[in-house]
Amino acid sequence: MGVVLFIFLVLFPLATLQLDPDQPVERYAENKQLLNPDERRGIILHALGQRVCCPPESCTDRCLCCLG
């Protein structure tokens, strides 16, 4: 029973954790916190597949163009 617990609680998470050696998780999370709230909102909505309403002069593929 102890071996099974060790495999599932220690080895399995280590095997599925894939870190890029040049960019640790702490640095990535810190960089995301430095974004302003509007940028974070845009990233989150883009990741969720939702589109943000933007002014017509700044239309991109990440947002919908609003009239007025």
Curated annotation (Swiss-Prot):
MF terms in GO: ion channel inhibitor activity; toxin activity
Could you tell me the keywords of this UniProt record?
Amidation, Disulfide bond, Neurotoxin, Secreted, Signal, Toxin
Q: Does the keyword Signal apply?
A: yes
- Transmembrane region positions? none
**Listed GO CC annotations:** extracellular region
Q: Membrane: is it a keyword of this entry? A: no
Please tell me in which tissues this protein is expressed.
Expressed by the venom duct.
User: Where is the PTM Leucine amide found along the chain?
Assistant: 67
What is this protein's name?
Conotoxin PnMLKM-011
